[in-house]
Amino acid sequence: ANKCIIDCMKVKTTCGDECKGAGFKTGGCALPPDIMKCCHNC
């Protein structure tokens, strides 16, 4: 499986809806830039 997609899924599991859309740093969910980009591209 694609590591990026796996990381994205981990982030979505950890951060929930904060990881979806553009508001990656809302609700106390601050993600590293590489993971944010990964999640955004997922």
From Swiss-Prot:
Modification after translation is described as:
Disulfide bonds.
Tissue specificity comment: Expressed in flowers but not in leaves, seeds or roots (at protein level).
Note the coiled coil stretches, chain numbering.
none
GO terms, biological process? defense response to fungus; defense response to Gram-negative bacterium; defense response to Gram-positive bacterium; killing of cells of another organism
Question: What are the entry keywords?
Answer: Antibiotic, Antimicrobial, Disulfide bond, Fungicide
Q: What biological function has been recorded for the protein in this entry?
A: Antimicrobial peptide. Active against fungal species F.oxysporum (IC(50)=5.7 uM) and A.niger (IC(50)=5.6 uM) but not against B.cinerea, F.graminearum, B.sorokinina and P.debaryanum at concentrations below 10 uM. Active against bacterial species P.syringae, B.subtilis and X.campestris.
This protein's name? Antimicrobial peptide 3
Organism of this sequence:
Taraxacum officinale (Common dandelion)
